[in-house]
């Protein structure tokens, strides 16, 4: 039974996504269905956490929209994500960047590294 579950989940894992870590700035292209139309919506922000593994792995992206912080959690292997672009690679020393929630303006900047 365990082998069967592993085989099914292995088929659904995505391999077309770039490598990214907390601190990186991503542009996530999400498929949104409105009535009978489907369109692509772009959500750009900083990865503040990545958790889980395998098919249940998720990541959370945070951005500031009109002065209000917006966080959105995506499953990594969902078909709703059309593509992910890495805009910048950030250098951080934590796996979970919850402290960014309290910071405003220039204090919330993350140092960029070249990869």
UniProtKB/Swiss-Prot annotation:
Keyword set, alphabetical order: Ribonucleoprotein, Ribosomal protein
Any one GO biological process: translation
Species per Swiss-Prot/TrEMBL record: Bacillus velezensis (strain DSM 23117 / BGSC 10A6 / LMG 26770 / FZB42)
Name of the protein in its database record: Large ribosomal subunit protein bL19
One Pfam short name: Ribosomal_L19
Signal sequence annotation: none
Family: Belongs to the bacterial ribosomal protein bL19 family.
Cellular component GO terms held in the UniProt record: cytosolic large ribosomal subunit
């Amino acid at each position: 039974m365990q082998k069967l579950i592993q085989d099914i989940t292995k088929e659904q894992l995505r391999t077309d996504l770039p490598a990214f870590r907390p601190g990186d700035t991503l542009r996530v292209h999400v498929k949104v269905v409105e009535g009978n139309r489907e369109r692509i919506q772009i959500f750009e922000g900083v990865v503040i956490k990545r958790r889980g593994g395998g098919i249940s792995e998720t990541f959370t992206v945070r951005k500031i929209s009109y002065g209000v912080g917006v966080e959105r959690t995506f499953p990594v292997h969902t078909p709703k994500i059309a593509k992910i672009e890495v805009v910048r690679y950030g250098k951080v020393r934590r796996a979970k960047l919850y402290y960014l929630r309290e910071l405003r303006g220039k204090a919330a900047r993350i140092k960029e590294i070249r990869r």
